[in-house]
């Protein structure tokens, strides 16, 4: 029972005594002199007289980078045994942040040591006695202050009592003290530096708008006064002090170093080139077209004889019998386009169609030449028979090689245009014109590898032709056509008329098949390519009973006074019976 009673007695809460003001110590504090190393005063602050003083309980940091502890009679920094006595610092400024004033890294410490350079200040510990920071009003307990973060309200006044502080920091000989003000304009700064203590009182005062800072340092220091009249002069000066030295480039390039680098690079290049120069080319096999530069040109050099292709070209040129129609013959009539007729809905399509019609009328492929050419041709003659053979061969070659339809129609068009300008008496040479027309069209329309002559020999009707002969005939074809080789063909106009007819795939396939078949008929040469293309689409629509479709084709095509479409349709009517 006694044990239970003892346990219950222990559990009873004891009344807590009244916590009065706890005295720091019964020992009397010694009287200290009032010394301040920093004095900040503003003319506006000096006008504010009678402001009550508020005190700071304690401070944990004197600098942003140092750790402060309270518990000894002195503030010590382990890195330097020398001491600097800091007395009392009074701050009287409405809205001024003491944390920014005392702990900000902008206000750097200045000691008597100028002999050592670039010492590290990390890892230093500072001990502050309880008496170093005294609350002059309430005597409240110590509390920690965050030096970096916050700002104090406007009507605060803070005072610090003196304490013995030991610093171990070192300042380099070349260190310059730069002050940056976060307040408004018109700041004035004066700095007084020395090397020993002075017994003057220091005060730090600040205002909201204008600021004047005086830093009083021990009187035995070497004095260096610098004053700036206004903030307009101060701010550029501060920028010059802290920034100009950073903008200057300290690097200097030596000409000797650059010369040596050039020599080394040249030596490396010479070594690389020497390795390639010693390479053995005995196993190198040149391409079969390696000698084509001299064989297929006029001559290798000015002193060398003409090439074999050039000599063949001169022979073909002498054998060519030119017709009476001049080479630059143009259309005799300027046709007026009627704007009230049906047009394409798309403006781009309409513009492309009109430009193609203009090229057709103004190009070297002229209707009068074609009519004269057709009138001279006899079905029993040499030229119509050879032309039929060449057209069939061109169609077969394009099908076997998988060439485009544009190449097929351009090759046949070049052949007909050349024969309309003249012909040869030799059958062998006339067949060679067909080969050259296809190879030239292939160069224009096709991509690699078909845009060059890769065959060494061509065989048609038991006739063998060399590559030199084909190239020489290509030169003659281009010269006879006045180098106007890319002309509108029937296939170019088929797309426009099929679009106007709104043709389905069946009508489109039939129209293209009729176009290929019509190439063997020389009567289509008496009409414009656009007229032939429109007639072929009309025939394809008639076969599939698309009456409204071919009527739209007629309306789109008939834009000039010379409407030969009905005659062309009648002349090609036989194609539907094939």
From Swiss-Prot:
Coiled coil (residue ranges): none
Basic residues composition-biased segments: 21-31
Keyword set, alphabetical order: Cell cycle, Cell division, Cyclin, Meiosis
Family according to the record: Belongs to the cyclin family.
Entry function: Meiosis-specific cyclin. Required for normal homolog synapsis and recombination in early to mid-prophase 1. May regulate the timing of sister chromatid separation.
Quaternary structure annotation from Swiss-Prot or TrEMBL: May interact with CDKA-1 and CDKB1-1.
Region described as Disordered: 1-31
Highest taxon of source: Eukaryota
InterPro entries found in the cross-reference section: Cyclin (IPR039361), Cyclin-like_dom (IPR013763), Cyclin-like_sf (IPR036915), Cyclin_C-dom (IPR004367), Cyclin_N (IPR006671), Cyclins_cyclin-box (IPR048258)
Protein name (record): Cyclin-SDS
Pfam entry (one): Cyclin_N
Gene ablation phenotype (knockout): Plants exhibit a severe defect in homolog synapsis recombination and bivalent formation in prophase 1, resulting in random chromosome distribution and formation of abnormal meiotic products.
GO biological process, one term: double-strand break repair via homologous recombination
